[in-house]
Amino acid sequence: METLSFEFPAGQPARQRAQVGCVGSGDLEVLLEPGPAGRLNIQVVTSVNGSAERWRHLFERMFAGAEPPALNVDIHDFGATPGVVRLRLEQALEEVSNV
């Protein structure tokens, strides 16, 4: 198991929380809650050691040129593919954006 932390610029805090997926279904759970203004904090707990670069590249592609809401994101991963990770993150971001 490995724990990774990432931080990206963000806008104002989201107004609600979101939970999508679960570790037993699709091997991934994403939890979002409002965070401090201007910061998107992501913590990944993964069963795949040595995957920090893959995660960093995925997040950089997702947030390049965008200003996501300020969030604290917890991701619990048990070997999900990058496509599943992106899908779950997009679902969670859509959920916190719909107020």
UniProtKB/Swiss-Prot annotation:
> In the record, which positions carry O-(phosphoribosyl dephospho-coenzyme A)serine?
25
| Protein modification | Covalently binds the prosthetic group of malonate decarboxylase.
Q: Pfam families recorded for this chain?
A: ACP
Q: Which keywords belong to this entry? A: Cytoplasm, Phosphoprotein
Q: Give the principal location in a single coarse category.
A: cytoplasm
Task: Please provide, alphabetically and separated by semicolons, the GO molecular function terms listed in this UniProt record.
Answer: acyl carrier activity
The cross-references to InterPro entries, in alphabetical order and at most eight, read:
Mal_deCO2ase/Cit_lyase_ACP, Malonate_deCO2ase_dsu
Q: Where in the cell is it found?
A: Cytoplasm
Q: List the GO terms this entry assigns under cellular component, sorted alphabetically.
A: cytoplasm
Q: Its domain of life?
A: Bacteria
Q: What does this protein do?
A: Subunit of malonate decarboxylase, it is an acyl carrier protein to which acetyl and malonyl thioester residues are bound via a 2'-(5''-phosphoribosyl)-3'-dephospho-CoA prosthetic group and turn over during the catalytic mechanism.
Q: Which family does it belong to?
A: Belongs to the MdcC family.
How is this protein named in the record? Malonate decarboxylase acyl carrier protein
- From which source organism is this entry? Azotobacter vinelandii (strain DJ / ATCC BAA-1303)
